[in-house]
């Protein structure tokens, strides 16, 4: 056979032609520069006579390993007499290979490092002092599995004496039935260890859905850091999944309690990731370090401290131990919205350690329904700092969404007064990382600015109220010239878009303008034409797109795309009226809001109507596929990441079937495990697939095989229907990814393809 032509022919992967391959090569180099930008995740401050020492936890995508590389960066903080502050950084960061969690002790003299195994090996606990490893304990699987470090059930807490650490870990595997070579059942205590025996599967146990596949029940443990002895805490019903444990104050020889959040999962465990509407409470159980191991658990009963409220999480004790503070998502639990406006509460903690039969819950921050223009819109937090207190003992610092930004607030626990600690004139997003006395160490970023470390010194304003003077900290983090060049010409602003459907039945807060973050190049329109525009839609729908830095979106901006990042009604940060206006109207009100924002940009002359694309994931993918069906001539290309395309087929296989009912009907009363024909008809009617006959927009689909939230079959059904119609589609499937599609290689390949796909139809 003549093979003379094969040497010059190039092997191209599916879907590539030589021109596209060249573009892949060009775009991949720039994208990698952006992907390499590290995240500043956490910080700890250690005080000494010579000043404060800061330790920062950072993470960076490792494309080769397809994991995040974690490392520590440390520096000395010196406050100068002229009110300036200097950070003196260590010359190099230190990689923390295999470390799952770092937890300094209250004094700062010890550091706990936890290393979770990737198999059935023991979990490692390491106790470090300032110069060396003091102790190392290996906790076998028969005691417990991996420690929870998920940011939700996660809770790792030192006691005040620094002799014990309480934490949440997977309970040990429950025994499975064993059968011999003939198939006969073998009793658990059987002495017959004959060859050929095998284990069955045993009873199925429900998990907490997306991101928790294969994870066992979270349970509470205490380790003695001197002896390494681990004690499982008895008396907690298995129907309660525990998390977020802290120690109660230990004063006057009073009894000490473990205080934690608990989620009930006795009837069904719905998906809990991103879902604040799962009922939960703050519990307390007494702990005595010299407790005999055979004591009856009833001698130390569990106390529900928040019986009168449907939600309680993130427990924190005030510095003086007088108050227990917690966050509540009762509005989400009571309404059914998966996230809604939160509230903050406090409980008086008894100095004698004797818990009353019922506790008086005091409201500190109540739910805001209709915020006045420029005023506090309500509380939207994902968690609290481990030590969020100023020196006065009653001022708590937290980070929350405030319209299209994230801000830092100071909350007076006694009066409930809320004041903004981050600059009130800043449209950047701010996140408090740690407190240095009354000063704040924070990170700030915007869609066009990489994350920067900030240091805020507390002072008083002209009215005598607390205010913070912020300093820029010269970070040792270096960014590539290509990244800085790509960002140098970018700018952003927040657009207010008046809504059109101001009906009488609409709540007042739902009549306010929506917001959209417009990101563009200062060089746009130099040739009289606007850059192509990407309409960017967040998921949820009860989530928000803040003015913060995203590596991948900044990459798309740097290659010539303007962005319109739309916070439609139903988003967080705008008060409860606006949020609750969407349920029952998904696929309609949110679609109209998105089209309104796009048309507003066109009318302002900042968008070319012939070069508009749309990008969204999850509910943002729901909106993306709705938009190309309801406005088939509006968008030249689309990209959807794990989109909801058909609620009727999703409801029976998702980990959150309640979401389908709530967003379709607007309340919880219709929920059932057996949807009726009428339910399925309504779901179909409100889904993008009901508009598929009108779709003609070329669409890229990015799907994760392990997605439990919007299982891959939902996207495939829509894709095949488009192919049947002859619509151009491209599909990328990531076999080891779940809903977020956030593994480094997946994130990289996804946005590389999004860029090339959009370039093809916008003719960049």
UniProtKB/Swiss-Prot annotation:
Complexes and interactors: Homotetramer.
Top-level division of the source organism's lineage: Eukaryota
Entry GO terms, CC: chloroplast; cytoplasm; cytosol; nucleus; vacuole
Pfam family of the protein (one): APEH_N
UniProt-annotated catalytic positions: 618 (charge relay system), 707 (charge relay system), 739 (charge relay system)
Coarse class of the protein's main subcellular location: cytoplasm
Protein name as catalogued: Acylamino-acid-releasing enzyme
Activity across pH: Optimum pH is 7.0.
SUPFAM superfamilies listed in its UniProt record: alpha/beta-Hydrolases, DPP6 N-terminal domain-like
Lineage: Eukaryota, Viridiplantae, Streptophyta, Embryophyta, Tracheophyta
Biological process according to GO: protein homotetramerization; proteolysis
UniProt miscellaneous comment: Plants silencing AARE show enhanced ion leakage after oxidative treatment.
Activity-regulation annotation: Strongly inhibited by the serine protease inhibitor diisopropyl fluorophosphate.
Entry GO MF terms: omega peptidase activity; serine-type aminopeptidase activity; serine-type endopeptidase activity
Annotated family: Belongs to the peptidase S9C family.
Cystine pairs: none
InterPro entries assigned: 6-blade_b-propeller_TolB-like (IPR011042), AARE_N (IPR045550), AB_hydrolase_fold (IPR029058), Peptidase_S9_cat (IPR001375)
Catalytic reactions on record: Cleavage of an N-acetyl or N-formyl amino acid from the N-terminus of a polypeptide
Compartments, as annotated in UniProt: Cytoplasm; Nucleus
């Amino acid at each position: 056979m003549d093979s003379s032509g094969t040497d010059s022919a190039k092997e191209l992967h599916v879907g590539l032609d030589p021109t596209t391959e060249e573009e892949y090569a060009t775009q991949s180099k720039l994208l990698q520069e952006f992907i390499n930008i590290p995240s500043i995740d956490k910080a700890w401050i250690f005080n000494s006579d010579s000043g404060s020492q800061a330790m920062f936890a950072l993470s960076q995508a490792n494309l080769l390993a397809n994991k995040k590389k974690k490392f520590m960066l440390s520096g000395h903080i010196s406050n100068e007499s002229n009110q300036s502050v200097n950070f003196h950084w260590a010359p190099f960061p230190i990689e923390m290979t295999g470390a799952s969690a770092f937890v300094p002790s209250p004094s700062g003299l010890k550091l706990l490092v936890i290393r979770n195994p990737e198999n059935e090996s023991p979990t490692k606990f390491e106790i470090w002092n300032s110069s060396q490893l003091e102790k190392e304990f290996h906790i076998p699987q028969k005691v417990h599995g991996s420690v929870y470090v998920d940011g939700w059930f996660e809770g790792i807490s030192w006691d005040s004496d620094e002799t014990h650490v309480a934490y949440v870990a997977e309970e040990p595997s429950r025994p499975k039935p064993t059968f011999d070579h003939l198939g006969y059942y073998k009793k658990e205590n059987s002495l017959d260890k004959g060859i050929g025996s095998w284990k069955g599967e045993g009873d199925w146990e429900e998990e907490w859905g997306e991101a928790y596949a294969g994870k066992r029940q979270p349970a509470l443990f205490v380790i003695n850091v001197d002896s390494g002895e681990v004690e499982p805490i008895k008396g907690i019903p298995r129907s309660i999944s525990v998390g977020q444990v802290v120690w109660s104050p230990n004063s006057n020889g009073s009894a000490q309690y473990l205080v934690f959040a608990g989620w009930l999962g006795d009837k069904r465990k719905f998906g809990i990731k991103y879902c604040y509407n799962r009922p939960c409470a703050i519990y307390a159980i007494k702990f005595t370090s010299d407790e005999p191991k055979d004591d009856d658990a009833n001698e130390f009963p569990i106390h529900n401290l928040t019986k009168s409220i449907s939600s309680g999480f993130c427990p924190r004790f005030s510095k003086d131990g007088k108050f227990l503070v917690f966050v509540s998502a009762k509005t989400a639990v009571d309404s059914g919205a998966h996230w809604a406006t939160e509230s903050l509460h406090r409980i008086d903690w008894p100095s004698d350690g004797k818990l009353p039969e019922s506790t008086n819950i005091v409201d500190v921050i109540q739910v805001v329904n209709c915020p006045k223009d420029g005023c506090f819109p309500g509380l939207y937090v994902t968690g609290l700092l481990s030590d969020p207190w100023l020196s006065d003992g009653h001022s708590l610092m937290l980070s929350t969404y405030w319209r299209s930004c994230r801000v830092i607030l100071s909350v007076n626990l006694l009066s409930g007064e809320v004041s903004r600690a981050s600059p009130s004139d800043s449209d950047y997003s701010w996140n408090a990382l740690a407190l240095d006395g009354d000063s704040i160490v924070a990170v700030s970023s915007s869609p066009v600015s990489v994350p920067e470390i900030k240091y805020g010194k507390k002072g008083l304003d002209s009215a005598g109220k607390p205010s913070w003077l912020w300093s820029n900290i010269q970070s040792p983090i270096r960014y590539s010239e290509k990244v800085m060049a790509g960002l140098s010409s970018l700018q952003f602003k927040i657009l207010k878009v008046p809504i059109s459907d101001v009906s009488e039945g609409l709540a007042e807060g739902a009549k306010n303008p929506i917001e959209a973050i417009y990101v563009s190049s200062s060089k746009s329109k130099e040739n009289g034409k606007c850059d192509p525009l990407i309409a960017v839609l967040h998921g949820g729908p009860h989530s928000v797109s803040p003015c913060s830095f995203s590596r991948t979106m900044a990459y798309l901006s740097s290659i010539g795309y303007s962005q319109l990042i739309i916070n439609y009604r139903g988003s967080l940060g705008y008060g409860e009226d606006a949020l609750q206006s969407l349920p029952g109207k998904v696929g309609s009100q949110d679609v109209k809001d998105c089209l309104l924002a796009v048309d507003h940009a066109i009318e302002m002359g900042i968008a070319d109507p012939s070069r508009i694309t749309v990008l969204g994931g999850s509910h943002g993918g729901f909106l993306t596929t709705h938009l190309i069906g309801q406005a088939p001539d509006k968008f030249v290309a689309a990209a959807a990441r794990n989109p909801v395309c058909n609620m009727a087929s999703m409801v029976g296989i998702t980990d959150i079937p309640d979401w389908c009912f709530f967003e379709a009907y607007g309340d919880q009363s219709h929920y059932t495990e057996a949807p009726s024909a009428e339910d399925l008809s309504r779901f179909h009617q409100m889904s993008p697939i009901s508009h598929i006959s009108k779709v003609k927009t070329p669409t890229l689909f990015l799907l994760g095989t392990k997605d439990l939230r919007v299982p891959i079959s939902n996207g495939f059904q829509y894709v095949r229907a488009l192919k049947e119609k002859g619509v151009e589609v491209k599909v990328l499937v990531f076999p080891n990814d779940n809903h977020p599609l956030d593994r480094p290689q997946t994130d990289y390949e996804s946005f590389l393809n999004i860029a090339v796909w959009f370039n093809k139809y916008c003719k960049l």
